[in-house]
């Protein structure tokens, strides 16, 4: 069993390994095919039933673990499957090109759009290159440049959020991390184009907010959105990181809880077992939601679009 398996996934993976073993027997021993196939079908039914049972009772901490799953799809995975003709744009024109944020122009069906998203890494080398999805000021300045470009070209802005938070290093602070985030918040609130934001994994604090002020804010079913990580909250409140599961429940970090609080617009369903189990199906669901949102936002003129966004921001914090 690989290292990329969460504790609550292990019973499911045990069954799947048995199914794979029996499948290899069928290929090598034709005589026992009938009996083995019957057992395979029984185990598959049991696997589906077990997965449904486990995933229908996930707590907030388990959802947080899924949001960070090593095999969970990242921004570039969705760009590859949802959009056409993606042309990546790099650099902030001030300091450097931050690989923790990717962006560029693409087509959603035939419509030009601007895409901005956090990008994590798969292996050690890429994780370091992408700084684990934690952007420095130059990343947010790059995002700001692309936002303004989208407004100039009058094309919709689509963002994908997946970060544990903005990079907290001394160098990032010296280069103006808080100011870079603040400028993005201000700019996104007044951009004269439709903005659709989707949390696809971790939505961590100001690092997430810096590209998530929009006309529509959606979350994938097993993503999270919070002002601090459960571990960070537990460390501050109880001086004990082991109380992270309690913090996760108390903070209300899950998509369905945030929908109840009217902090997001839609929860996008994931396949049974999570997005990493079926990236294509997740991409189709995400694309469908993006097209629905764009169709709705297209019905508003510029003045109405900005007024609705303003009212949305002003109502945060009200029940």
UniProtKB/Swiss-Prot annotation:
Substrates-to-products reaction catalysed: N(6)-carboxybiotinyl-L-lysyl-[protein] + acetyl-CoA = N(6)-biotinyl-L-lysyl-[protein] + malonyl-CoA
SUPFAM superfamilies: ClpP/crotonase
Pfam families found in the cross-reference section: ACCA
One GO cellular component term noted in the UniProt record for this chain: acetyl-CoA carboxylase complex
Superkingdom to which the source organism belongs: Bacteria
Subcellular location as annotated: Cytoplasm
Residue intervals passing through the bilayer: none
Enzyme class, UniProt record, top EC level: transferase
Pathway field: Lipid metabolism; malonyl-CoA biosynthesis; malonyl-CoA from acetyl-CoA: step 1/1
GO function terms (MF aspect): acetyl-CoA carboxylase activity; ATP binding; carboxyl- or carbamoyltransferase activity
Keywords noted in UniProt: ATP-binding, Cytoplasm, Fatty acid biosynthesis, Fatty acid metabolism, Lipid biosynthesis, Lipid metabolism, Nucleotide-binding, Transferase
Keyword Cell membrane annotated: no
Keyword ATP-binding in record: yes
EC number annotated for this UniProt entry: 2.1.3.15
Residue ranges occupied by any CoA carboxyltransferase C-terminal domain in the UniProt entry: 39-296
GO biological process, any: fatty acid biosynthetic process
Family: Belongs to the AccA family.
Quaternary context: Acetyl-CoA carboxylase is a heterohexamer composed of biotin carboxyl carrier protein (AccB), biotin carboxylase (AccC) and two subunits each of ACCase subunit alpha (AccA) and ACCase subunit beta (AccD).
Function: Component of the acetyl coenzyme A carboxylase (ACC) complex. First, biotin carboxylase catalyzes the carboxylation of biotin on its carrier protein (BCCP) and then the CO(2) group is transferred by the carboxyltransferase to acetyl-CoA to form malonyl-CoA.
Descriptive protein name: Acetyl-coenzyme A carboxylase carboxyl transferase subunit alpha
